[in-house]
Amino acid sequence: MTSRRFSQVDVFTTTPYAGNPVAVVLDAEELDVETMQRFARWTNLSETTFLLPAQDPSADYRLRIFTPARELPFAGHPTLGSCHAWLQSGGVPGDPGTVVQECGAGLVQVRRTDTGLAFAAPPLLRSGPVDVELVAHVADVLRIDQTAIMDTQWVDNGPGWLGVLLHSAEAVLALQPGVVDLDIGVVGMHPAGSLDALEVRAFFPIDGRTVEDPVTGSLNASLAGWLTSTGRATTPYTARQGTVLGRLGRVQVTRDDGGTIWTGGAAVTCVHGHVEL
């Protein structure tokens, strides 16, 4: 085993222990996939990441992202938390204004903002309408009547999200889902004039049970593309997530002059030290 630098970063919050944590191994050279997956299972966080030297010359580093069950090509809060840890540990980007992350989904740009960091999400792996039969199944596992669903859309930019729009933020907060068998992101609008525009919840299966993710960058990024393209949301806006779990997650969504959607927020380091791997 080797002593490797390690950080645990809370993402999408300014308050430690109130966002979504990610475990970051900063010196992951020579670790095999089995060791990475075993460590991710041991941390039991929604994601654990491993920083490696970039293979693409235009990237600043390469990132591998693991849930307790599998590797992901991309995920949002691990991207921001890992970038935060890399910068805090002395990482210097080739371009002072932008960090370039290499991952399974390709190259992802991360930039500093007034509130922390923001990423430009990679293209969707799957989009478009959801089959009627699957919509009925989603309503069943969410334990709601199908008429409560305003719209659905595939919004998969890596983890596999299926987006579900309900009539209100209140309806989202009231959800008590059963056992889900796919990754479901649910969103509803807060009343006009509210500090937060959207309420978001994310559910996914692990070992036959339903897990709710505290705050989800990838989902918020893909929801932003869907909701802004259909005129249901206008950037800039803030989405709230983790409320039911007692978290204070806030996700800022903006669009630049070129039409790129940036998804971001604050990050704070809660644990820093070394891990034996």
Ranges and model annotations:
Residues 1-74, 80-277:
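Active-site proximal loop and beta-alpha junction motif in alpha/beta enzyme cores
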